[in-house]
From Swiss-Prot:
Membrane-traversing stretches: none
Keyword Nucleotide-binding: no
Record's keyword terms, sorted: Signal
Signal peptide as annotated in the record: 1-21
InterPro entries attached to this UniProt entry: UPF0319 (IPR018635)
Superkingdom per UniProt: Bacteria
Organism: Aliivibrio salmonicida (strain LFI1238) (Vibrio salmonicida (strain LFI1238))
UniProt key word Signal: yes
Protein name: UPF0319 protein VSAL_I2129
Amino acid sequence: MKFHSFLAAGLCLLTSLSASASIQLTVPSEVELLLVDSQEVKLDSSFFSTTSTLKLDDGEHQIVFRYNPVFKQGKDNIIVSSDIIVSKFTATNQDISFVFPSYNSPEKAKAFNTDLNWELKDQNDKNIPFAQAKLVYDGVQIGHNIQFELAKFNTTEHVAAFKQDMITVTHKEIKNEKGENTAEQMLNYWYEKADKETQERFKTSISN
């Protein structure tokens, strides 16, 4: 009887620890978090706080963001926006924060686009390893449908690509500025990638 009680208590403890184990990502005000694991997110923040937080399950995650430091020049606020950055990391039960260089002018902050010298650190000030890339297409910065372009990026072999979430993204209805949805764009994308024989089979299937 005591053994069963001990076993039950142990299972309850393990369940409790498993349920409470998670990642907390702290996002400063100068970071524009666009997507997490290919989805838009809502951050938790308080009225007087300069940071926001996001809870994630333990494991591998992909974040997409811009770095937008703000500089005061007279009565004006000058914002320097970086290119869109894709990053993939793995963590377990850690509080993670962004760390960026300290820039004292907009001109110096523009160097971030070249250096990409930021870090992720946990609650013990230890570095969280990550892979990163700019979300660009043929050298041009993406501006319209980030989720669609990210879905294409995730089909590549880049170390920052996030394979496991592709199906979720390609089936989600997301309208872009031209009124096209992501499913339609993905169909066009894969049609262009296919050989002639596959294209003919596709056209036959949709005409029947």
